């Protein structure tokens, strides 16, 4: 199962968090969900964000405002000189949504350890007609050099302009997709070439997450329920014995 599903969706609530954090009633939920999708596509389409390497857009809704957090490897490009770009982005989003919007920028210090940015980099090189094997080797080596414990990159499409599409994959280190406490990042990007679209998938393993970052209450709850059931069965046996003695 871990090989098929999204590693991020499988680990939500364990060591991953939701990109959108808000509560809504059944009538409002669909409208707010589509609004979140519109905000993300809107931000990525702005000219100020084209070459900013934005990996993720978090949306947090408060009663009075909407907070948008952009995770980027190039915060200077997003902010601009004296904050001109970020003010322009905030004003445009606020105008289209007709709501009070607060824009925040969070820097990604190591872009080689972000699966989405690695996939985007590979897709960019494939669009520039660089050899796909060279792209995969360079991306894999750069990721492992930055401190990752494992990486898997898969490309699929008309590789090298071949008439038949195929899938190629490169692995280095280990990527334990079935282990829920493993910190695995996943990213997907598309390269649009003259021969067609090429899909790029990246799985990146950064190590195990222990302590408060993992949920440990499941085992304790199971042990507690077994203990309680054992105590109840002992009480039933005692009651039967007392009834038998009285009879």
Curated annotation (Swiss-Prot):
SMART domains: KH (SM00322)
Any GO molecular function: mRNA binding
Keywords: Ribonucleoprotein, Ribosomal protein, RNA-binding, rRNA-binding
A GO term from the CC aspect: cytosolic small ribosomal subunit
Keyword Ribonucleoprotein (UniProt): yes
Bias kind Basic and acidic residues: ranges: 227-247
One BP annotation, GO: translation
Top-level taxon: Bacteria
Residue span of region Disordered: 224-247
InterPro entries: KH_dom, KH_dom-like_a/b, KH_dom_type_2, KH_sf_prok-type, Ribosomal_S3_C_sf, Ribosomal_uS3_bac-typ, Ribosomal_uS3_C, Ribosomal_uS3_CS
Pfam families, per database record: KH_2 (PF07650), Ribosomal_S3_C (PF00189)
The KH type-2 domain, residue ranges: 39-109
HAMAP family noted in UniProt: Ribosomal_uS3_B
UniProt-listed NCBIfam families: rpsC_bact
Record text on subunit structure and interactions: Part of the 30S ribosomal subunit. Forms a tight complex with proteins S10 and S14.
Function text: Binds the lower part of the 30S subunit head. Binds mRNA in the 70S ribosome, positioning it for translation.
PANTHER family attached to this UniProt entry: 30S/40S RIBOSOMAL PROTEIN S3, SMALL RIBOSOMAL SUBUNIT PROTEIN US3C
Family of the protein in this entry: Belongs to the universal ribosomal protein uS3 family.
Protein name (Swiss-Prot/TrEMBL): Small ribosomal subunit protein uS3
């Amino acid at each position: 199962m871990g090989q098929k599903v999204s590693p991020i969706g499988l680990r939500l609530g364990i060591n991953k968090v939701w990109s959108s954090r808000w509560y809504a009633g059944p009538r409002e939920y669909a409208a707010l969900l589509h609004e979140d999708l519109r905000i993300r596509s809107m931000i990525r389409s702005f000219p100020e964000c084209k070459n900013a390497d934005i990996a993720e857009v978090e949306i947090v809704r408060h009663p009075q405002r909407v907070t948008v957090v952009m995770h980027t490897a190039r915060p200077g490009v997003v902010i601009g000189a004296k904050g001109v770009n970020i003010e322009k982005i905030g004003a445009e989003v606020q105008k289209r949504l007709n709501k009070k919007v607060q824009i925040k920028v969070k820097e990604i210090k190591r872009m080689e350890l972000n699966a989405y940015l690695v996939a985007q980099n590979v897709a960019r090189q494939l669009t520039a007609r660089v050899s796909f094997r060279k792209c995969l080797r360079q991306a894999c080596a750069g990721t492992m050099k930055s401190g990752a414990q494992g990486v898997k990159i898969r490309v699929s499409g008309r590789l090298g302009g071949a008439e038949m599409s195929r899938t190629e994959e490169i692995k280095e280190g280990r990527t334990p997709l079935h282990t829920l406490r493993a910190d695995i990042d996943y990213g997907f990007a598309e390269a649009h070439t003259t021969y067609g679209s090429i899909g790029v998938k990246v799985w990146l393993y950064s190590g195990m997450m222990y302590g408060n970052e993992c949920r440990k209450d499941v085992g304790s709850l199971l042990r507690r329920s077994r203990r309680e059931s054992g105590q109840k069965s002992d009480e039933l046996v005692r009651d039967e014995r007392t009834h038998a003695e009285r009879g």
